Amino acid sequence: AKRYSEQYNYSMDIVYNTIEEMIKTKKPEAVTAFGNIYDHLKIVEVCAPAGIHVMVEKPLAVSLDHAKKMEKLVDKHGIHLLTNFETTWYPTNQKAYELIQQDTIIGDLRKIVVRDGHKGPKKIGVNKEFLEWLTDPELNGGGAITDFGCYGANLLTWIMEGKKPNSVTAI
């Protein structure tokens, strides 16, 4: 927290040791959970009973079991739970969506190819803390397939308005 305080120039007065302490003190309407994926469930377990909405960074959960537990909490307590997939907001993807929705421009989609990747987290310079949980199977849940594969799955689910594909191939 101290490193982030210095890096982003904010006071340590707004840093709390636990989410419970922060919620009790600040009483937020919503929180964002942009840490390791395993902790998404804990954040929802703490926030949902207090009626606090939650936005997590992709993917939603490390497992179907965690996702189902979050779903039950959301339903029981009536909160919103949003998964942020940043690529959805890219202007290029917004334009692609717009063109696809206008039937007369592109026509029926028959095949979609998604390619994602980079040189690797170390080569692109991610910080030590992020690298530690990103490469931990328990904290991350699925490695590169959940870190990058989820973008294509999200974009295509959005573009196809939830219609399931006939087949999927991954290389």
Can you name each region flagged by the protein language model?
Residues A1-Y8:
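NAD(P)-binding Rossmann-fold cofactor-contacting core
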Residues R3, E21, A30, K42, ...:
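Alpha-helical elements of Rossmann-like donor-binding domains used by nucleotide-donor carbohydrate transfer enzymes
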Residues Y8-L73:
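Beta-loop-alpha module in the N-terminal Rossmann-like domain of NAD(P)-dependent dehydrogenases
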Residues M12, G51, G78, G107-L109, ...:
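A general structural motif
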Residues V15, H40, H66, F85, ...:
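Conserved donor sugar-nucleotide recognition element shared by glycan-biosynthetic enzymes
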Residues K58-P59, F85-T87, D116:
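Short strand-turn motif at the edge of the Rossmann-like AdoMet-binding core
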Residues K69-T87, D108-R110:
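Rossmann-fold dehydrogenase core element
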Residues Y90-I171:
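Predominantly a Rossmann-like dinucleotide-binding segment in NAD(P)-dependent oxidoreductases
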